[in-house]
A protein has these predicted regions:
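Eukaryotic scaffold repeat domains enriched in small/polar residues
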Residues: 1-179
Length: 179
């Protein structure tokens, strides 16, 4: 159910699922030497058929576990994992992603530092001045995808069959003179 978001620099990176770093048949040519020289991080991986697989993330600036729902590839199975989800990056480089298991959206900055999170469990009757149930302020049952602009965040809530429009505010603002 949970996956990770990985941030690679413009020079690229790789996620290796094969301990021998075999290049898949779909890739043409060998990985460049500068990529292979980058540091790696070993992580647990779920490849659809095994929860005990190992993976190596090479050349990443950071990775964040907690992106959900994450679509699994069920190799050799007739199980349908039909949901895919989406995260977004705003004009300032902040990453907005759904955390379906916690009924919220989480936000990290360009260095993977948590900035904020918003949303709580709620159904179609929840939230808003005209709602039958006034709380929570930002109700979510199945936050599936997120889109962010410089002023608003849009969240597709599959179970509640709606798109939430959340206005971004700042707790404090300060101006200074530029010399």
């Amino acid at each position: 159910m949970y996956g990770s978001i990985v941030k690679f620099p413009p020079s690229g990176g790789a996620i290796w699922y094969d301990k021998n770093r075999k290049v898949p048949d779909t890739v043409t040519g060998a990985p460049p030497a500068e990529l292979l020289a980058k540091p790696t991080v070993k992580v647990q991986a779920h490849l659809g058929y095994s929860t005990e697989a190992q993976a190596e993330i090479q050349g990443a600036e950071w990775y964040r576990f907690g992106f959900s729902p994450h679509t699994l590839i069920m190799t050799g199975s007739d199980t349908c994992m039909c949901y895919g989800s989406g995260f977004d990056v705003d004009p300032y480089g902040r990453v907005f992603f759904p955390n379906m298991g916690q009924f919220r959206v989480e936000v990290v900055d360009t260095a993977n530092n948590p900035i904020t999170m918003f949303g709580k469990y709620g159904n179609q009757d929840s939230g808003g001045k005209d709602a039958a149930v006034k709380k929570p302020d930002i109700p979510m049952a199945w936050p599936l995808s997120v889109a962010a602009s410089d002023t608003h965040v849009y969240v597709a809530d599959d179970i509640n069959r709606r798109v939430l429009k959340v206005r971004m505010n700042h707790a404090a603002e300060e101006s200074c003179e530029v010399k």
